UniProtKB/Swiss-Prot annotation:
Domain of life from the UniProt record: Bacteria
Protein's UniProt name: 2-oxoglutarate dehydrogenase E1 component
Species per Swiss-Prot/TrEMBL record: Coxiella burnetii (strain RSA 493 / Nine Mile phase I)
InterPro entries, per the entry: 2-oxogl_dehyd_N, 2oxoglutarate_DH_E1, DH_E1, KGD_C_sf, ODO-1/KGD_C, THDP-binding, Transketolase-like_Pyr-bd
Enzyme Commission number, as recorded: 1.2.4.2
Amino acid sequence: MPKITMQQFQKNSYLADNNAGYIETLYENFLKDPHSVNEEWRSYFRTLTNGASTPDISHATIREEFRELARKPRSISPTAITPAAEQAAVDLLIEGYRRFGHLNAKINPLGDNRPVDSRLELGHYNLTESDFNKTFATYGLLNKPKATLKEIYTRLREIYCGSIGVQYSTISDERERNWLRDYVEQRLPSIEFDKETKRNILQQLVTAESLEKYLDTKYVGQVRYSLEGGDSLIPLLDELTKRARHQKIEEIVICMAHRGRVNVLLNIMGQSAAELFQEFEGKKDYGLMSGDVKYHRGYSRDVKTDAGPIHLSLAFNPSHLEFICPVAMGSVRARQERQNGHKRDYAMTVMIHGDASFSGEGIVMEALSMSQTRAHHVGGSIHIILNNQVGFTTSNPHDARSSMYCSDIAKMLDAPVFHVNGDDPEAVVAVTQLALDYRMAFHKDVFIDLVCYRRHGHQEVDDPMPTQPAMYKVIQEHPTTRTLYAKNLIEKKLCTAEEVDQWIDDYRDRLDRGRQLVETLPEGLSAHYAANWTPYLGQDWTTLVDTTLPLKKLKALGKKFSTLPNTLHLHRKVEAIYKARLEMAEGKTPMDWGFAEMLAYASLLEEGFSVRLVGQDSRRGTFFHRHAVVFDQETGKEYEPLKHLSDKQAAPHIYDSLLCEAGALGFEYGYSTADPNSLVIWEAQFGDFANVAQVIVDQFISSGWQKWNRLSGIVLFLPHGYEGKGPEHSSARLERYLQLCAQNNMQVCAPTTPSQIFHLLRRQVLRPYRKPLVVLTPKSVLRNKLAVSSLEDLARGQLKLLIPEIEKHDPKKITRVILCSGKVYYDLLAKRREHKGKLNHIAMIRIEQLYPFPYDELKAELEKYPNAKQVIWCQEEPKNQGAWFCTRHRLIKCMRDDQTLEYVGRSAFAAPAAGYSALYVKLQEQLVNQALEI
């Protein structure tokens, strides 16, 4: 094999799959003989283990030791084993505990009946208790270079088989693995909590338990999804919040499901008891909002810590478990980027999962896959699995998942997982410190599997005994975590039973008085954390705003982003596009869609509004029209024209996303809820695929304002249009978005000209109105010679909610008016022009905004044609799809009494479109001819 220099290897990405075998071979050779590899690699490999307390052992050596052990009979006399072989056996024992110790860790508060794993027994390595007094090298396992086997074995049992089970041995990064090993073996066992810390942990458990008991007696039978059994979550979050602030984190966004949410609201977030009681008693006034149940409510507040205040936000959450995860990540990314750049340690995501949903919901995998991508990384999230070992009525792991642990999906991230017994609150707090320190060191996700139980049924009124009799017999006899820990501290004389009783009484007294249970800052002092949404409250969609720009400015901006460095070696097609854009910028040729769209972005960036556009092919554009990022054909180097407009411009964030819809759209929605001053766009590769993200659309985008009073200006680009590409590449399912529209909750538009998309995008940001915008974007129309605009359309025009007839006809001679939306207009226009002068009795009106519907504009337009008795709605989509059913009553409302409304389009169809090209052409020609009476 030829020698490869380090520089060459890095250029080819030495972490790539096709290089993995080669680099592993080099590393194995290095471990056997450092001089067997060249100096560059030798130096590099040494940096991997620099500072590690234990040297790596090559896989070949370990395999050979196992072969040697297998060849020797078990009854071999200890005296016959050489000291080197004994040391190797001890090395394997240590490695075995690092890899498999978690299998016998005491992590289940209800008792663990797992058999002892043979790989954790001395005999597996040909060692016995008779070897206990022999001395071996420890390689940093203990605080001395050598120790007896008994000391080593005892230490291994204490570290790896106590209340904490650790999984980190499969992490591929040597530096991370060494860091975790040293932390687990050196720092974690040395953590000693002082008296005050232990008393604080107990006080946190008192608050967790006392709240649930108080609510259980005050609001009998009301559903609250009690935390009981998982009480250690409260000291965990308390420690996490305080330690995060000490490490300079200023904001934490927490997302969680319903279990324990009420407890977190009061005991961590600082919501007052009086506010919560209003929810229980149904006294909260939501006005015109629908509101939501108390265990879905979000909250935000500045909580005091001894290191300063920290802003905590608990994300609003639907019952659709885990879909909040990418939403919370997006919110954190926006908060980080608001700080004059992507500051990963300014804000952090804490995700609290259920064991059943974490291993069961596919959105979890999407969120994890996003965590290290350029478009979506947030510097690492803390994941807490509230593992109560049951999902509603399903407690058999063979039904709940196909893996040993509910956390096993985390292995895909090469991330550490810490399983911890919820009945050992000190271990819980210690693991919390470890998890946060790892996140801060490596900016990667980390997982805490908080193994606990659910004291009641799924709801407080639900009886779990019919389906989990054995488990709940144990739970009924099992003391609470607070009881166990209080007993422990009382026995150690760190507190008295009377003190504990007094803490409980004091807590209940504060609840009786409706007080806050956590010290927070007054709301007026916390404004610097939050984006200012005040200008957007109470605004109407009809608010007018000037979206034009002076012609001179338009030309200058167009020239800036269309002029690329001469050093770039462009693809010939891309070069032609940018050459054409320069001519458009000069006004020599009409502009196409791609130019107008880029011009809209450039203008907003120059005015100080950042632009974030993310989708599976968004940098180039699925249909090769955008090219917001261009690539040097010789070096592969990227160049983003929109980053080079001016020194004071805002930042563009244009990324290709990973191949997912729900997670990616959820992320962008979350981003948009935390930054009203950015144009945030998620683009589907084809509109057809957006229904993979239907939960995000249904539970967040369309209803977030109504349920939670949450504004969002997110934009959805959904390529839509019937062009013979079959049922999976034709329809964005327009009908579904229109069906969701009510109370001006969002906007649905189908712009058909470049000037329309320019004004539409600028309106979305410049107008003091923040509601989601669904845009049916074109495909073939991107290059349709009829779909062009001039610079004057941008300098003097505005967004038209509908576009009237564009050709000159005598209004009195018009007897038939065709109303349509989207690409079908150009099919109608082309066909009408084929029949020159023969169809002058037909006028065509494009409705560009389908919701909120432009009643006044359409009514005024129809009034222009006094003799038009026939009004036609023409659409490409089947009759049971498209805009027809959701729009016809609106059309009728705008018509005169002497007018009739007819439908022209495809018949009702189970599939969105025909799969056969010939059938598509036939049906398309039929509907166009029928609309034009040909």
